[in-house]
Amino acid sequence: MNDYHYVYIVECSDESLYTGYTTDVERRVREHNAGEGAKYTRGRTPVQLVHFECFDTRSAALSREHEIKSYTREKKQQLAEEGTDINQP
């Protein structure tokens, strides 16, 4: 069982960026691409994962999601360009 919590950013087909929370990044991206994800992404498929971060607790992940959602597009793009820290838990 996966005990980690993730915040992720996907780039939509219209080049917009969507930030979300999940416990399974691969499943969530598949859901977005199948039209079963957030209402925002349904008309903007396909989406591509550009960034994710891993957390030990749901509250930490949701706090980070809220923080990233307040970022400008430029700051979100910077996160995507920096990549994902694969050494996270």
From Swiss-Prot:
It comes from the Archaea. Residues 3-78 form the GIY-YIG domain. InterPro entries: GIY-YIG_endonuc, GIY-YIG_endonuc_sf, UPF0213_domain. The lineage of its organism: Archaea, Methanobacteriati, Methanobacteriota, Stenosarchaea group, Halobacteria. Belongs to the UPF0213 family. This is UPF0213 protein HQ_3675A. Pfam families: GIY-YIG (PF01541).
